[in-house]
Amino acid sequence: LLTQLASQDMDGKSFEVKGTAGSAANLRLLSDHYIELGIAQADLIHDAYYGTGDFKNDRLSGYKAVASLYAEACQLVVRADSSIQTLDDLQGKTVCIGEEDSGTERNAKQILEMSGLTDQIIDTVNLDYTNMAKQLESCKIDAFFITAGIQTTVIEELTRRCDIRLISLDQKCINKIQSAYEFYTEYTIPANTYTGQTEDVHTISVRSVLLADTSLSDKTVERLTKALFD
């Protein structure tokens, strides 16, 4: 719907949907004017604007915020038969932290860092959503992180192939992360969000924001916001 509305104001040019590695990639593509619309996490938008964090000495510009969309929960998934019950149990395990240059990777690294879980303690790998689910199912990895709106499709689809559990972050970890990084909000994934999930899961979240190239007309941006909120 959004792409259809936007294309009406672009002199007959249609938008093409592109798959990317995630937030950081979208910000760079917007800044280089390769894409005209993209979604990114608020924490990465902040760093890209100020040239901090993952964008140290690499300030990006050329895009504007259109709307805050929804909370993206940092979700840690294991097989139901796994011995992993807490973050500390990841020691000595193989953990997928998402694709390179993605918001998931950044969030996972910060959670692990705040929990004292360095690369010397756990083995981290980079995989896309589809392959992380496949490798957890086949026991090639022990856990994966994914930052996304809840009722995440890839997680729910995985429940149809094997039993899984979501791991809660302990309150000490949540407090420490919130103190260090202002964009994180404490978040609860309600019981029964996923098949077989019988208890609430406690974690953190970041906001997802719709961005547009600065060259996109105000009229088009107005149509986009109306489509979202009217």
What are these language model-derived features?
Residues 42, 52-53, 82, 118-211, ...:
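Pocket-lining segment of extracytoplasmic ligand-binding domains
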Residues 3-4, 16-57, 132-135, 151-158:
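Pocket-flanking alpha-helical
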Residues 10-12, 22-25, 32, 60-63, ...:
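Extracytoplasmic
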Residues 1-17, 68-138:
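Bilobed "Venus flytrap"/periplasmic-binding protein-like clamshell domains
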Residues 20-24, 39, 99-106, 127-130, ...:
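Soluble non-cytosolic domains of exported or imported proteins
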